[in-house]
């Protein structure tokens, strides 16, 4: 019957109940200690906070990188820039139209992930920004409607 007793002990909850009771007592003691500590502290504590600007909005930390991709794999470095919280200006004059569209599609997914924006600022030139940048104004009125991209 030693085998039966061993199996019974393995599936028995007697030890589990013992440990659960110990944990309950410890948590009760910890709660009592924390209430004693908080009651000895003053009720009204004045906390001063300094107004901090987010890292992306601080003009000293904001960067805009210039990219002129020549192959599709250059899109990874542009995406890394955006994911790092920095803006990029991308000039597609050195790449064919099909590759430029693929890169724009890739960057569109990256921008969607960080809730950013892509803005066309010239013929074959785009401004790509994460959500920490704000773009105001439009340049599309000055661009040709049937031009590249």
From Swiss-Prot:
**Short name of any one Pfam family annotated for the protein:** SepF
Regions of compositional bias (Low complexity) in chain numbering: 25-41
Q: Which GO terms describe its biological process?
A: division septum assembly; FtsZ-dependent cytokinesis
Sorted keywords for this record are: Cell cycle, Cell division, Cytoplasm, Septation
**Region annotation (Disordered) ranges:** 12-57
Biased-composition ranges for Polar residues? Answer: 46-57
Q: Tell where it localizes.
A: Cytoplasm
Quote a single Gene Ontology cellular component term: cytoplasm
Comp. bias regions, Acidic residues? 13-24
Family membership noted in the UniProt record:
Belongs to the SepF family.
Subunit field text: Homodimer. Interacts with FtsZ.
Name of the protein in its database record: Cell division protein SepF
User: Source gene?
Assistant: sepF
């Amino acid at each position: 019957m030693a085998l039966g007793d061993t199996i019974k002990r393995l599936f028995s909850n007697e030890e589990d109940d013992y440990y659960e009771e110990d944990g309950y007592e410890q948590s009760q003691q910890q709660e009592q200690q924390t209430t004693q500590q908080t009651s000895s502290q003053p009720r009204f504590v004045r906390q001063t906070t300094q107004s901090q600007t987010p890292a992306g909005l601080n003009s000293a930390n904001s960067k805009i990188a210039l990219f002129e991709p020549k192959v599709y794999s250059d899109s990874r470095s542009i995406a890394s820039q955006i994911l790092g919280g920095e803006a990029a200006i991308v000039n597609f004059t050195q790449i064919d139209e099909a590759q430029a569209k693929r890169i724009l599609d890739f960057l569109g997914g990256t921008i969607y992930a960080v809730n950013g924006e892509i803005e066309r600022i010239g013929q074959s030139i785009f401004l790509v920004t994460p959500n920490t940048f704000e773009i105001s104004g439009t340049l599309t009125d000055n661009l040709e409607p049937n031009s590249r991209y």
